[in-house]
From Swiss-Prot:
This is DNA topoisomerase 1. Pfam families: Topoisom_bac, Toprim, Zn_ribbon_bTOP1, Zn_ribbon_Top1, Zn_Ribbon_Topo. The gene is topA. Residues 39-54 have a biased composition (Low complexity). GO terms for molecular function: DNA binding; DNA topoisomerase type I (single strand cut, ATP-independent) activity; zinc ion binding. It comes from Salmonella typhimurium (strain LT2 / SGSC1412 / ATCC 700720). Monomer.
Amino acid sequence: MGKALVIVESPAKAKTINKYLGNDYVVKSSVGHIRDLPTSGSAAKKSADSTSTKTAKKPKKDERGALVNRMGVDPWHNWDAHYEVLPGKEKVVSELKQLAEKADHIYLATDLDREGEAIAWHLREVIGGDDARYSRVVFNEITKNAIRQAFEQPGELNINRVNAQQARRFMDRVVGYMVSPLLWKKIARGLSAGRVQSVAVRLVVEREREIKAFVPEEFWEIDANTTTPSGEALPLQVTHQNDKPFRPVNREQTLAAVSLLEKARYSVLEREDKPTSSKPGAPFITSTLQQAASTRLGFGVKKTMMMAQRLYEAGYITYMRTDSTNLSQDAVNMVRGYIGDNFGKKYLPDNPNQYASKENSQEAHEAIRPSDVAVMAESLKDMEADAQKLYQLIWRQFVACQMTPAQYDSTTLTVGAGEFRLKARGRILRFDGWTKVMPALRKGDEDRTLPAVNKGDALTLLELTPAQHFTKPPARFSEASLVKELEKRGIGRPSTYASIISTIQDRGYVRVENRRFYAEKMGEIVTDRLEENFRELMNYDFTAQMEDSLDQVANHQAEWKAVLDNFFSDFTQQLDKAEKDPEEGGMRPNQMVLTSIDCPTCGRKMGIRTASTGVFLGCSGYALSPKERCKTTINLVPENEVLNVLEGDDAETNALRAKRRCQKCGTAMDSYLIDPKRKLHVCGNNPTCDGYEIEEGEFRIKGYDGPIVECEKCGSEMHLKMGRFGKYMACTNDECKNTRKILRNGEVAPPKEDPVPLPELPCEKSDAYFVLRDGAAGIFLAANTFPKSRETRAPLVEELYRFRDRLPEKLRYLADAPQQDPEGNKTVVRFSRKTKQQYVAAEKDGKATGWSAFFVDGKWVEGKK
């Protein structure tokens, strides 16, 4: 009797499962997806050829055939799709096919969500053979008991879940491949659109505009420091005057109130003591885990999911992509037993705590919890420190969710002082309950003990403290709060939140500073154009309804191609209209806002323009015929780039108060330095609003306030300058001409090594040869004829070793790195933007194999990126 083949999607998961299955099973990993829609038109040639005979007659259909060729899916012919094995996965597929031929049975044990179901389906399609040879096994946790139960009751592939995944993939593909070229034509090259990503960007853009439109309003508060008859301190806050809420709006009103309060007699009018309680929160689902990890651990969404994935694959937690707060009966019994044994009966409620899930959540799934509550974070020796921290957070929430409420004694004191009322609130913890395992992040203002005073007691005034405040604009989204907003609006699902957050940052429409989202100007323009021409696509409710439709497909309540057809019919109508000229209702172009600034080259007026790289001044003569065209541009240095990153609770308010307001629409203006003599203030609603102002004066280019920088080449001082591409440091020695960049964080970039010519390494695309250069993202090879030839690539370690003697001393360690991985694949030098360090990675056919090595403590160490 032969062995059974078990296929999972990750090596770590395979290793864990292998511990629980006997010698009758061979467990192998597909290392994620093995095939997908093509990444280029050439890879989908077969699909295009299948329709070429029908589409060759008319030019428009020729274009359609080319589009289908690029997309790999044909929405005009029953959504016919052409899948291809992903580059670099040929060896994996070949090995799986060989093992499948020898196996008696094949178990597809990929993850239990739609993505996992789709991977299982692709595996079956590629490996082939009789469907009866395949079984689908799913489990919520990788434990011995869960694995045993799954293999005792194997099922079949759920094709409805596969179709739901395909429908999402096809819709996203169509929007990306059909709207993006329109944006290139109408607005700027290199732009992209996405069915869900564009809606997520809209959330950030709308919040940005709410902030810019917000006008901070002044208000004051008065605190009173008093003492009781026994001499105890009692701080109070003025809350009412003549039975109306006290909220003075200027210094005069405040000082008038202070004058009255200084003369008043203070006595206790009322003391209210009452018991209060605080119930524990539900066990984590994907979105709440991401939010808690952000708040308590400072983790980004991507990092949280990466750590959770590793914990799941190692068998320590249940599946991490879930929207259900449901707990299995076994899990409830396990944690209640643990609470009773370790904390006592006081901490154990009579009945298990129940938590409601969202209406469309997958009740068959569980919340995220430890597989074994007896396993403590410190015992996870095989896990990295951050994974242990996340496990502890999950463990604490799981245990806390089945504990009794925390009990408090809450007190409110009301004090009279003439026509004023003052209040103080306090709260004493009487029984810690669930907070014993999940303590609060920080104590609130009310978590204090108030002195023992009674109604009628006289108080002595020590000091009055008036304080000026300003109302705050809406808070910027963090990664976690944006996920919360997406979830609230029904946009995306647990399996897609992390990719949505990553994608909108990668596309350049938003940026993250100090863990908060800022909309880029190009993001605002693209959002406006998409809202004007693709109202349904950008509509929050429509996007949520589409998620519901995909849920219906997964639950066999809707036919997937019918859902796709309905979507595509409406979408193409909007696309056809958007393609027209603006006068006919088509998408508006990216127009400049004309200014009074003269072009230094031709004298025509300059206009405010927006590109994917930012805002700049461009000559209005650029629109003329090639013979008369003027291509002059003036770089603008954004003031938000030359200031420190906003920090503190009042930073956003203070920044808004410092900005000018547009005279046309009242929106806060963005400020840019044109040169040391001129500053340009542009309406925050530009280009929709054409308001701008030019301020003249003496402007010091901010951006570097550090110590004196010495030129590494000649020893002279370096001074701050501003050029076409922004701020930089320049050597004061005219003969030296050395420069160094100013980084976004305001620091001076480290010195770069001089280029190293390597005539022995010819370029592939020209007659040039490569030069080894040192850039902001590490070393790279570039053509010696740059910019005529822009060919670049990463250097092979074996090439660095070959020319080691020519390398500067500080780069020679890279030449000593491993030249091959254990399988003989050559290594190249790469740069980690996260650690700001260079490392080496093995590649095959231009794709990373997953093997890498890092330079640690003076030696090269094999590891994971």
